[in-house]
Amino acid sequence: MAKVLVLYYSTYGHIEQMAHAVAEGAREAGAEVDVKRVPELVPEDVARKSHFKLDQSAPLARVDELPNYDAIIFGTPTRYGNMASQMKNFLDQTGGLWMKGALVGKVGSVFTSSASQHGGQESTILSFHTVLLHHGMVLVGLPYAFQGQLGVSQVMGNSPYGASTIADGDGSRQPSPIELDGARYQGRHVAGIAAKLAG
């Protein structure tokens, strides 16, 4: 049985919803799954005034626990085509793990959200992949075997790089059923590959 960590940062709750869908999919594949988040960096009074979702139940992750997992599925909103600073801050603390090669051979995967269809989802995931490659992780995306990323009949996220959702500029759009299905599929897919690699 693979041990999977879903590690995310969510400002308004979109990535939080996707994270739980990813975890659900990984559990369906028989994995042992933990869902954790990285710390908020924005001062609490500013976050409250900006209507951040501060009641997220997932516990905070610690850098030193990352090697305990066979796979880590990361979730971050897009910030100008890159990961959020909260996630980058957490990853910047993994230098000690890099020095030891502690994540070499682990499965890494990424899901994201953006305000618009062209808001940088793919560049966010691809730039995130650079960090995972430096750690020697095995990259897994969302294959076209998931049919929910095909077609243009509706506004939707998801790409072969990873599951995604579109939040709209004011955050009013919630993850759609097809986007959540993509997240669940990615969770199942990653868990299945991690189980094979873990032997």
Curated annotation (Swiss-Prot):
UniProt keywords (A-Z) are: Flavoprotein, FMN, NAD, NADP, Nucleotide-binding, Oxidoreductase
- Annotated residues for binding of NAD(+): Y12
GO molecular-function terms, A-Z: flavin adenine dinucleotide binding; FMN binding; NAD binding; NADH:ubiquinone reductase (non-electrogenic) activity; NADP binding; NADPH dehydrogenase (quinone) activity
Q: Which reaction does it catalyse?
A: a quinone + NADH + H(+) = a quinol + NAD(+); a quinone + NADPH + H(+) = a quinol + NADP(+)
Instruction: Give the protein's cofactors.
Output: FMN
The EC number(s) attached to this protein equal 1.6.5.2
- Which PROSITE patterns has this protein been placed in? FLAVODOXIN_LIKE
Binding residues for FMN, per the UniProt record?
A: 10-15, 78-80, 113-119, 134
What does the record's cofactor remark say about binding?
Answer: Binds 1 FMN per monomer.
What SUPFAM superfamilies does the entry give? Answer: Flavoproteins
Return the HAMAP family for the record.
NQOR
Per the record, the similarity remark reads:
Belongs to the WrbA family.
Q: What is this protein called?
A: NAD(P)H dehydrogenase (quinone)
